[in-house]
Design a protein with these regions (language model features):
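Beta-rich, aromatic/charged-enriched effector core domains that present basic-aromatic interfaces
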Residues: 78-144
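N-terminal beta-strand-loop-alpha-helix module at the start
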Residues: 1-70
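Short beta->alpha junction loops
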Residues: 69-78
Length: 144
């Protein structure tokens, strides 16, 4: 087991089983911290989504507590600012599942580049989509 802290960035994938990022963090590290970045401005006028999110986080936290894993909910205005601060800490590895929205994909590209340049252990996993876009091919091997 790796002595570094394993961080799992919980996004919009609240599966407990077959959550590949969470599985990777818990099998490779003795200490795991799960964190959710809450951007208040995203939910300003979306009361139903806030309710769903609070219930999902509460249920996920209960399951994590059974495994002695902490869930930290961090309110931030910017993913970039949060990760710029986090990257200055050295003894961690980070895992997360992909979110397929364009803004998230753009940020993932930025984050993957920064983590690689800083030589921080990291891995992004397929999200809760059935197939990645580039995995679906026609019979002749070309994309649809």
């Amino acid at each position: 087991m790796d002595k570094k802290i394993g961080l799992f960035w919980l996004r919009d994938d609240f599966r407990f089983i077959k959550n590949h990022g969470l599985i990777e963090a818990t099998t490779k590290h003795n200490q795991v911290v799960v964190f959710y970045l809450y951007k208040k401005d995203v939910f300003n006028y979306q009361e139903a989504q806030k309710w769903w999110l609070s219930k999902s986080l509460s249920n996920f936290k209960k399951k994590l507590n059974e495994l002695n894993i902490t869930l930290e909910i961090v309110e931030t205005n910017s993913f970039k600012n949060f990760f710029d601060d986090l990257i200055n800490k050295k003894d961690f590895a980070i895992y997360w599942n992909k979110v397929y929205e364009p803004d998230y994909l753009k940020f993932d590209k930025y984050l993957l580049n920064i983590l690689k340049n800083k030589k921080i252990d990291h891995k992004r996993f397929k999200g809760n989509a059935l197939n990645e876009i580039d995995e679906v091919k026609k019979g002749d091997g070309t994309p649809f």
